[in-house]
A protein has these predicted regions:
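P-loop (Walker A) phosphate-binding loop of NTP-binding proteins
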Residues: 23
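PAPS-dependent sulfotransferase catalytic domain
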Residues: 56-62, 156-277, 290-300
């Protein structure tokens, strides 16, 4: 498959990735899933690497321009902005180039899981259509010929849905702390800050290990602190870059008024409304499947931390997002980015 990039303007036009940020267990995944049903947007797995990559890239630029006319970047007049955005365009092109491969792998994973449930496939779920998977698919024909036919057709056409999609959405929560760096890589990127009431998030965080086997937070106090850090970082980005770059979305409005919420969101993204984006919401959302009787309270938790988080959560519910950008806040984020570069230099 080849990308249909007719000219430089087309290349610029499609270099507009979307990042869903916010605290873990706030709805980042379901929102990205909804957007992934749009005819022009496809979801990618949480990437995690691009935030730190931007910091390393900035350090590399400093080295490459350290000696003025005797360093390649400065001698050739390659600016910090050009250096970053050029590499960002390369990342974007690479993601677009392999979008059909991602679709195919996801489909094969779904097929392998289905076959394992039916006892026809005993191997690992790898996303690779190996000999064992092929043999299991053939066996499946004897079990359900109709579904077998649909399954084979799906495997043959895997990737066709995403072939002409020109934008991707990433839902890595940790990117809440890296919005400044990501904007250097992708100057036209848009960010969606999805926010959910803190108590629900904490319950979901503490219950997460029951279904995923890993802990998002060691205890209740750490969960409240985690929510505070991520949400404050996103609020600072809202203030710094304004409503044309960072869009605040409340988790409750997505559930209670999905159509109007997605219409408004897609308008922000510059995409036409598509009712297909509602399809993932037709299934009941139960974040982390938190049991009604699940107890998250810990007597060792500092009540001041809980109060601080609940107060901020209530303020967010009662206030609107900023109506304009703040140069002062943007400078703060630039300073934080610079501090990370200095820290990297020290540890290296």
């Amino acid at each position: 498959m080849t990308l249909r990039l007719k000219n430089a303007e087309m290349h610029e036009e499609i270099n507009k990735p979307i990042f869903v940020v916010g605290s873990p267990r706030s709805g980042t995944s379901i929102l990205a899933w909804c957007l992934g049903y749009h005819p022009n947007i496809f979801p990618v797995p949480e990437s995690n690497w691009m935030g730190d990559f931007a910091v390393n890239l900035a350090k590399s630029y400093q080295i490459g321009a350290a000696r003025g006319i005797f360093s390649i970047l400065s001698a050739m007049g390659i600016s910090h902005e050009e250096f970053f955005s050029h590499i960002g365009r390369s990342i974007n092109s690479l993601v677009l180039k392999h979008r059909c491969d991602l679709d195919r792998q996801r489909l094969i994973i779904a097929v392998q899981r289905l076959l394992k449930e039916r006892g026809l496939y005993l191997g690992e779920v790898t996303g690779e259509f190996d000999a064992a998977t092929s043999a299991a698919v053939e066996q499946y024909e004897m079990v359900d010929k109709t579904l077998y036919s649909e399954l084979v057709d799906s495997l043959r056409t895997a990737g066709s849905d995403s072939e002409y999609k020109t934008r991707w959405v990433d839902q890595t929560p940790e990117y809440s702390f890296h919005i400044c760096g990501l904007r250097k890589l992708f100057p036209s990127a848009l960010f969606i800050h999805i926010v959910r009431d803190v108590d629900s998030v904490v319950r979901s965080m503490l219950n997460f290990h029951r279904i995923a086997g890993t802990h998002l937070a060691a205890n209740e106090e750490e969960a409240y602190k985690y929510w505070l850090r991520t949400v404050r970082a996103c609020l600072k980005a809202e203030e710094a870059y304004g409503p044309h770059v960072v869009y605040r979305l409340r988790y409750t409005t997505l559930l209670e008024n999905p159509e109007s919420t997605l219409r408004s969101l897609l308008d922000f993204l510059g995409e036409p409304y598509s009712a297909k984006c509602l399809e993932p919401l037709s299934e009941r959302i139960n974040s982390s499947n938190v049991p009604p009787d699940f107890k998250s309270e810990d007597p060792a938790t500092d009540p001041a931390i809980v109060e601080e988080a609940r107060r901020l959560s209530a303020e967010i519910e009662q206030t609107s997002r900023p109506t304009e950008c703040s140069p002062a806040a943007a400078e703060e984020l630039e300073a934080e980015f610079g501090t990370r570069i200095k820290h990297l230099a020290r540890v290296q």
